[in-house]
């Protein structure tokens, strides 16, 4: 009974979070309610069941052969890709429908609405109650047209997650397309050391009042931090840092006055921070040596000056790209892209059991209208014995376009200059629009 009630609560919550759009004016009203200090991007899905996932990740055969797809396309039409960087090549492939790790976005809310309304029907086979296909007298399968509800997803992306098309971080993610399907990496102790640094900074902030009376002579009296703390101590729980510092003062400076002890703690925290940063750098080099050799080679094909080290955080990121406006379609659609990295494989998990080149997730806080897959917690990852990874989704308020209103909205958008002929400058698309018009 509890399970049924829980499911009913979930369904009710999902329904409450849906806003059905019936006209352009209703849509503009909803969009105008959004308040954010970040950059707003839109994506229109003609089918509300679609996920924020690039084409190459929609079928396993694509991600398994991503490196082959990339090279095959260039080998067939090399003149179209001559002189282009990897990200420029991926953008051109995306333009022609090749599966890539890019996902189209737009900065124009009406353009996204157009794409959400682009298709209103889908054809499906008719199914009998026993699950078999319905057929006619000749034994041919019967089909029916089903309405498709669309959706506009709205993202609010911070400046630090937006990069120009020629940035080093974009080059890192773009060149993942050249890596084989068995590419994976582990962060080893990198994540722990990063968290440790954050905790040390918090402790420094708590003791910042003693900076004004900072005694440089007192600092000179301290030995290297290695004389007070072992490498094993760096893998203590972060909340034990304060106790560790107090123990060092008690054991090594028992005769110091209270004021000096407080200053000594701050000095020790500074030394601890520097030591942790050094360990973090060594850990980063280790990860590069073990996992990123081929990736670095591919990046240097684009950027010969690229440093011989890759930040693991960048490999597992998602970035919005400030596109190069060298394509009439991108210009007309006010388009840009998300580019997706690859998530790390956790230490306790066999990489062979993980999905191929596991996709990095869009941070849930970016999505302000729509649904988004959220990170599975560490315990669930380690205890999930299923061959299929479990999916958790955060449902936020969704802008749903019912199939019955799509045609009406398309006509309204056309009056505002948003139609197939204005968004797609190619002659065949203009011809399609004119045929539909008459």
PLM feature spans:
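Catalytic-core elements of nucleic-acid end-processing and repair enzymes
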Residues: 1-438
């Amino acid at each position: 009974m509890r399970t049924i009630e829980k499911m009913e609560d979930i369904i009710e919550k999902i329904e409450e979070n849906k806003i059905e759009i019936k006209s352009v004016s209703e849509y503009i009203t909803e969009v105008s309610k959004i308040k954010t200090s970040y950059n707003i991007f839109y994506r229109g899905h003609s089918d509300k069941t679609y996920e924020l996932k690039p084409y190459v990740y929609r079928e396993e055969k694509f991600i398994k052969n991503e490196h082959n797809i990339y090279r095959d396309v260039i080998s067939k039409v090399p003149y179209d890709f001559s002189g282009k960087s990897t990200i420029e090549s991926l953008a051109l492939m995306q333009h022609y429908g090749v599966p890539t790790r890019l996902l189209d976005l737009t900065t124009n809310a009406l353009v996204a609405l157009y794409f959400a309304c682009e298709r209103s029907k889908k054809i499906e086979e008719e199914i009998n109650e026993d699950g078999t296909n319905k057929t006619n007298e000749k034994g041919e399968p019967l089909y029916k047209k089903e309405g498709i509800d669309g959706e506009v997803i709205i993202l609010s992306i911070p400046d630090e997650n937006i990069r120009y098309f020629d940035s080093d971080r974009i080059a890192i993610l773009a060149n993942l397309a050249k890596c084989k399907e068995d590419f994976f990496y582990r962060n080893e102790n990198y994540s722990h050391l990063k968290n440790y640094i954050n905790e040390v900074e918090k402790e420094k902030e708590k003791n910042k009042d003693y900076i004004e009376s900072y005694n440089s002579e007192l600092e000179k009296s301290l030995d290297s931090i290695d004389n007070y703390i072992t490498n094993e101590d760096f893998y203590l729980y972060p909340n034990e840092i304060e106790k560790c510092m107090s123990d060092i003062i008690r054991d090594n400076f028992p005769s110091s006055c209270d004021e000096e002890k407080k200053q000594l703690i701050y000095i020790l925290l500074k030394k601890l921070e520097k030591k942790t940063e050094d360990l973090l750098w060594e850990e980063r080099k280790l990860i590069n040596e073990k996992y990123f050799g081929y990736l670095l080679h591919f990046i240097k094909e684009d950027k010969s000056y690229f440093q011989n080290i890759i930040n693991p955080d960048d490999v597992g990121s998602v970035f919005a790209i400030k596109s190069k406006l060298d394509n009439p379609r991108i210009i007309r659609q006010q388009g840009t892209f998300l580019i997706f990295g690859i998530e790390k494989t956790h230490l306790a998990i066999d990489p062979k059991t993980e999905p191929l080149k596991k996709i990095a997730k869009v941070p849930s806080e970016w999505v302000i209208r729509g649904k988004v897959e959220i990170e599975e917690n560490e315990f669930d990852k380690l205890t999930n014995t299923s061959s299929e990874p479990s999916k958790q989704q955060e449902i936020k308020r969704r802008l749903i376009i019912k199939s019955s209103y799509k045609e009406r909205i398309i006509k309204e958008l056309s009056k505002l200059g948003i139609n197939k002929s204005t968004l797609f400058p190619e002659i065949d698309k203009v011809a399609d629009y004119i045929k539909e018009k008459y």
